[in-house]
Amino acid sequence: TKKQIYEDIYDDSLWLINLVENLLAVTRLEEGRMKINLTTELVGDVIAEALKHIHTKSEKQKIIVIQPDDLLLAKMDARLIVQVLINLLDNAIKYTPSDSQITITAKQSENMVCISVADNGNGILDEQKSRVFDMFYTGANKIADCRRSIGLGLSLCKSIVNAHGGEIKITDNIPHGAIFTFTLPVGEVEIHE
């Protein structure tokens, strides 16, 4: 139908805009041309903002947030960290069954805030783990519409987290699945007198 064609064109144009924005962001970050506006933010608010932009495959697919400290603060450019969370959550949704559970955990570890996105999908092979953050690497797990996954999302995540002075890594979620964890500097409450 015409309506479906228009919807497909609209979806494809949004995908293309997102692709160009991600590519420009990675390039600017790696060349040091993107200014990062660090402010102290409530981690829970940033997670909530990212979740507004996420659409699961089905109602059975659940996203759970575990954050022991409601007042957890981190220094970040909130707009960029929202993008990191969106990319990690989109990946988890894309590579897990429609009845799966995705867990976001945020906690403080010494002078860093650790935020992780865990899924119970098939996981990532050990030989792919060292390359998942490389630009244009999509791995062996091809999705139905493989042109949609060109390997920019995780590369952008790494560039953003590194620009914040943090690190990002991937580990196995036992018995199956993957956990992406990134760190940000702890934020402090600023009191203006």
Where do the model's predicted regions map?
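Short conserved segment of the HATPase_c
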Residues: 124-136
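Short alpha-helical Gxxx[C/S/T] motif in the catalytic ATP-binding
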Residues: 153, 157
